[in-house]
């Protein structure tokens, strides 16, 4: 990072568009997903941070309080996959976004979904503001797994990503993980982000790791949405196979989504429902860290990923990792855990058994993981990203 980067960033007025929902209650802003906490920290490096996204009219709070952050609401629609709702919301959204640009220097537009992302990017250029694109996922791959058989959505995703990649040749892009960096390698300028919510104080030392792999129970932990692209039903199969070899295994699942009932049914079908606890969504500061500390392994079975935040959290907790080799996962996990093919319960169960039985391998992996996560703390990632967003001095 340039020596003057922090000073430069401190005078930048930054707006961020992301296709997330927010709620406002009693004058306070609440965010739907923990990525917003990363954005909140990014605001510490700017003169002004303004978030813009869907205002959910449903009463109640989302889990994450966004203190000290300005908010410009956009019309609500249920999902970027519901194109009619997206298009109905677009005229009012365009007018609101145009007004937002009046007192802004830099705009980070995360996309390529929904279509508004591309429109907002073009409006930013028309208003002669600095535009930086942001990409967190392989959209066509995500749509293929989340909406199987819906070819029109997959084609729309291909078109949106193609337009984003074409625009990226003219403007800088910040992507999550090396896999997406490869897809956007022809961008005018490229920065790789690791979305981390970890402070240095969260990273355990070897002396603080008191896990007992000879205990009466072994707990595997899964953290993530229970949606098709995350492949949560495989967790039941992994648990069943692992328990055949070692009856001590139990499963903790943190996350909610469309496949929760299907996962419960699959656990019953395999006769392992009494070995599993489905906790629902557990906020970062609402008990999730304790579950990392109490677990013996993290199991991550997604079909598609950028760089999962949960892997960094497991690294910080010195929790051994078994993960599918998809997206940006191999680059992050290399030397820090075991990789398995997607949708292969036998391979995942075998990897769990290998790690339980090899103390030296576990120690090497968690030591490497601890060193790696120190490179990607929340403060470090936000400093680097803020400097990139601000642009050349």
Where in the sequence are the language-model features?
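Conserved acidic donor-binding segment of nucleotide-sugar-dependent glycosyltransferases
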Residues: 338-345, 354-359
